[in-house]
């Protein structure tokens, strides 16, 4: 935060150089995340695509990578995408992304995650916006999450 503040205040020396370095690292991590998912592939469920990055993609950028997969050609825009990544506290961070077209068809990822996490219980938490949302679950809840989330989306999207 200090770096960003100093750059906004006009620093074009040390802090600007640091900001450029941080930006380059961020772009590198995104590029590597996209390449990893192109290599590993994305799985397809009835109502969504998903991938489990484990700890290979930082949980802080896994949602960005998920959204970028639409533009990279790795997935079509006909279903939302769900991304799993390990969080530092040994929980699983879930990031979901949709498209404007899916929103027009009734998609609400925030609601779907909230409902799914309520059914999972055991400290699962989720919510967000129609087009992008997130959740945190225990690692042993991934399979149940996929099934419940699939059912939740079936009740939303209409052709």
Language-model segments: residues:
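A structured phosphate/pyrophosphate-recognition subdomain
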Residues: 1-46, 50-56, 70-73, 84-87, ...
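Glycine-rich, acidic loop segments that terminate in or are immediately followed by a histidine
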Residues: 46-159
């Amino acid at each position: 935060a200090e770096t960003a503040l100093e750059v906004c205040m006009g620093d074009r020396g040390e802090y600007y150089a640091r900001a450029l370095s941080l930006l380059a690292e961020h772009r590198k991590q995104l590029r590597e995340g996209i390449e990893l998912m192109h290599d590993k592939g994305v799985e397809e469920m009835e109502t969504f695509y998903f991938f489990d990055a484990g700890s290979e993609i930082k949980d802080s950028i896994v949602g960005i990578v998920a959204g970028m997969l639409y533009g990279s050609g790795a997935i079509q825009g006909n279903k939302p995408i769900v991304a799993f990544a390990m969080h530092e506290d040994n929980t699983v961070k879930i990031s979901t992304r949709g498209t404007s077209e899916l929103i027009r068809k009734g998609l609400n990822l925030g609601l779907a995650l909230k409902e799914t996490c309520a059914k999972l219980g055991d400290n699962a938490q989720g919510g967000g916006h129609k087009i992008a949302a997130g959740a945190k679950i225990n690692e042993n809840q991934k399979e149940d999450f996929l099934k419940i989330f699939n059912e939740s989306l079936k009740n939303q999207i209409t052709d």
